């Protein structure tokens, strides 16, 4: 069942039919394809290319196809080349020869281009809503757990921070992701419908009308670019990759924190699994799967970049390969965002363990150096003094605050009784710009 064949002597082989067909994956574009066709038919009637009665018959037929698909009466299956063929052939079967006028002034090249832009735009707004849900979960988790913990560099305990500071770093990441997606929408918000195969059409059509009907801000500037542009999908895949990278980093920390080596958090049973052989195991599989699926989205980005790198203008069948990877990335990002929101909303903090971890690792060493600077010593000299104290403490299994004043004075006579209050862990967060964290 094809929309072409007049110039061919021999039938297409079954092997080629199967190899060429995209129906099994581009069927998810059925709504966009029907919506685009309805806008196209309205425009053809407005421009006097179709009669008013023909317009109504075709639109009614398209709506009936949409309703039957939505209600499960019509299954998207069979020996069709793609979703466009499926809908047009079913339309002709329903309304007769008038349905053959649907494709007047249009190519599948601009048809699939507008379908993909509509889908990409719609799904991006949907993903933004998933990000908004995650941002709310992060904010609630941070605000409801006022606890201090170690901050890390090089995965080594570094300085005292609040849990809120740590979690709001991820808020900043995902908020950037949202801004990036909004920028992607701004760039892609142009209609390619009316570009034809590559050089427009001899019909006096109204591209601006269909652009408005379909909710685009304008028409594309160049016909050839309009049908062959997949930059917006690559840009979205790049944005999706960054979202997954941020989810993966957060997942990695949840995996570490839930281990007995850290024991900072407890991931709920709802987002954990067990072992078939080790009865004691409770594995952070939700976080591990998010971390693992990140490479899958990266692969979709690299796949489309590689597909597009050597294609001459204008449309080439290579571009059919834009869909499976993009659709898979969309599904992966949506599921990963949803799972992360669920995992964080049920996360339990082990606050005592977090606080106790602060007491190990000399997390107040920087504050001790600042103390000496406030007493008049140059910071580099203070850095050296505190480094020597830390070495002594390590060798003697003590903390800086455990040393008596007399011992501290053997390293520097600027130390006084107020050093203990100055380097107390919670007090260190109440000075200077740190008060804002």
Swiss-Prot record:
Query: Where primarily located?
Result: cytoplasm
* Single Gene Ontology MF annotation: argininosuccinate lyase activity
Catalysed reaction(s)? 2-(N(omega)-L-arginino)succinate = fumarate + L-arginine
Q: What keywords appear on the UniProt entry?
A: Amino-acid biosynthesis, Arginine biosynthesis, Cytoplasm, Lyase
Q: Name one GO biological process term.
A: L-arginine biosynthetic process
Cellular compartment(s): Cytoplasm
**What is the E.C. number?**
4.3.2.1
Q: Which domain of life is it from?
A: Bacteria
Q: Which GO terms describe its cellular component?
A: cytosol
Under InterPro entries, the record lists: Arg_succ_lyase_C, Argininosuccinate_lyase, Fumarase/histidase_N, Fumarate_lyase_CS, Fumarate_lyase_fam, Fumarate_lyase_N, L-Aspartase-like
Pathway where it operates = Amino-acid biosynthesis; L-arginine biosynthesis; L-arginine from L-ornithine and carbamoyl phosphate: step 3/3
What NCBIfam families does the record point to?
Answer: argH
Tell me the protein family, please: Belongs to the lyase 1 family. Argininosuccinate lyase subfamily.
Protein name, per record: Argininosuccinate lyase
Instruction: Say which species the protein is native to.
Output: Clostridium novyi (strain NT)
Q: Which gene encodes it?
A: argH
């Amino acid at each position: 069942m094809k929309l072409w064949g007049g110039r061919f002597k021999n039938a297409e082989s079954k092997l080629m039919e199967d190899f060429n067909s995209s129906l099994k994956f581009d069927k998810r574009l059925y709504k966009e394809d029907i919506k685009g066709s309805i806008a196209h038919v309205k425009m053809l009637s407005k421009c006097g290319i179709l009669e008013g009665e023909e317009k109504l018959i075709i639109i009614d037929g398209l709506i009936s196809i949409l309703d039957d698909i939505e209600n499960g009466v019509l299954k998207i299956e069979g020996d069709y080349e793609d979703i466009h063929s499926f809908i047009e052939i079913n339309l002709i079967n329903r309304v007769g020869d008038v349905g053959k006028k649907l494709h007047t002034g249009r190519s599948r090249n601009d048809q699939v281009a507008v379908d993909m832009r509509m889908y990409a735009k719609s799904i991006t707004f949907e993903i933004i809503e998933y990000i908004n849900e995650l941002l709310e979960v992060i904010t609630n988790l941070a605000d409801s757990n006022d606890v201090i913990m170690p901050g890390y560099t090089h995965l080594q305990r570094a300085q005292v921070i609040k849990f809120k500071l740590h979690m709001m770093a991820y808020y900043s990441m995902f908020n950037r992701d949202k801004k990036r997606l909004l920028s992607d929408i701004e760039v892609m918000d142009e209609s390619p419908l009316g570009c034809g195969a590559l050089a427009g059409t001899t019909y006096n059509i109204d591209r601006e009308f269909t652009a408005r009907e379909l909710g685009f801000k304008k028409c594309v500037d160049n016909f050839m670019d309009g049908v062959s542009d997949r930059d917006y999908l690559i840009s979205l895949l790049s944005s999706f990759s960054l979202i997954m990278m941020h989810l993966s980093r957060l997942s990695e920390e949840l995996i570490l924190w839930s281990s007995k080596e850290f024991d900072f958090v407890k991931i709920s049973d709802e987002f954990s699994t067990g072992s078939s052989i080790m009865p004691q195991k409770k594995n952070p599989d939700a976080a591990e799967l998010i971390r693992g699926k990140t490479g899958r989205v990266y692969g979709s980005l690299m796949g489309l970049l590689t597909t597009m790198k050597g294609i001459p203008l204008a449309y080439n069948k290579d571009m059919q390969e834009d869909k499976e990877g993009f659709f898979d990335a969309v599904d992966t990002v949506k599921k990963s965002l949803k799972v992360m929101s669920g995992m964080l909303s049920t996360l339990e903090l082990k606050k005592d363990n977090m606080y106790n971890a602060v007491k190990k690792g000399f997390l107040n060493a920087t504050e001790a150096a600042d103390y000496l600077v406030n007493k008049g010593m140059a910071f580099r000299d203070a850095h050296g003094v505190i480094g020597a104290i830390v070495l002594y403490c390590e060798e003697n299994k003590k903390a800086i605050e455990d040393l008596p004043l007399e011992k501290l004075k053997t390293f520097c006579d600027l130390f006084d009784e107020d050093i203990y209050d100055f380097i107390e862990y919670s007090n260190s967060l109440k000075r200077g710009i740190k008060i804002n964290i």
